[in-house]
Amino acid sequence: GLSVGESPEQRNEIVQYLTPQLPNDKPRYLMGVGKPLDIAYAVNNGVDMFDCVIPTRNARNGHLFTNKGIIRIRNNKYITDTNPIEQFCKCFTCKNYSKSYIRHLDRCNDILAARLMTIHNVYFYQEFMRKIRVAIAERRLGKYIEELENIYLSQGEQNGNY
């Protein structure tokens, strides 16, 4: 039962043990792992592919991924925030809508809120994986993981606090 109840530490230990035993000419797939730092750790240990509901489920629950951590759009501080979810994000949502408007839609239970937040989170994950590929190509994946740890561990993200 990998990724079904074990701690992140146990999962990382299992992945670290198993991936060297898998064939190098076959893709290595880890199901159900979707937190950014967990993905980065798994990639660092040789995993190639993932699938997980986290980007879409979290979007439906008002949790938005950014390069600075998680934004919880339902928090009152976003009532009047006219900025996009992430300033330099090029997704459709960030180019066209403010946090306050998305929060308003979410609080009104408008289905458009879930759609806009999902668009953003899926785009974030595409960019996140692109950054991982660049970090691998530039031989600085370890440094990139340290940056991610500074972001997500400081927010308590790896312990399910999102």
Residue spans for each PLM region:
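C-terminal extensions of enzymes
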Residues: E86-Y162
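Glycine-rich phosphate/ribose-binding loops and adjacent secondary-structure elements
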Residues: G1-I85
